[in-house]
Amino acid sequence: KVPDGKGGSGTEPRFIFDVYIQSQADAWQVIKDIAAGFNGMTFWGNNTFNVVSDMPADTTKLQILTRASVVGKPNYSSGSEKNRYSSALINFSDPDNHYQDRTTAVMFPDLVKQFKFKQTQLTAIGCTRESEAQRRGGWAVYSNYLDRLITLQTGLDGFAYVPGTVFAFADERFSGRVY
């Protein structure tokens, strides 16, 4: 449960996927669209189709990798500031308007100060609540902002990880901080 966005102490489910598929489409694309409805990710691995969801991780139980676990050197990267957003317009299906698309917006003043006003637009597939659409827009903006990426290769201990696995990485080049 998450706050319902109306103030007070009301809560609602984090995601409700409320969709009616009305046309034929490529199965892989339909599954990817469904996974997008809960911030999921699809991938093909080990000769099976896999879906993982974006869920909060218990940071006290994360596996910590160190440079000793890495073959070669880790490579850090992130996107350009030119591609940073400070707000989002989100289309969602409004049940009060016969499920016609309606647009809602989110904006983050701290990011506007840092990157100026840059807007992205997205469609929240299967979303029928404005509060959920705003959360999805906020997730899109902040995940775009917090995009430090590390690329690394491991030995056999790397078999424990699949795409979407959350882990910590301790690198002495960052003064012993864990990222």
Language-model features: locations:
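C-terminal extracytoplasmic interaction modules
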Residues: 1-179
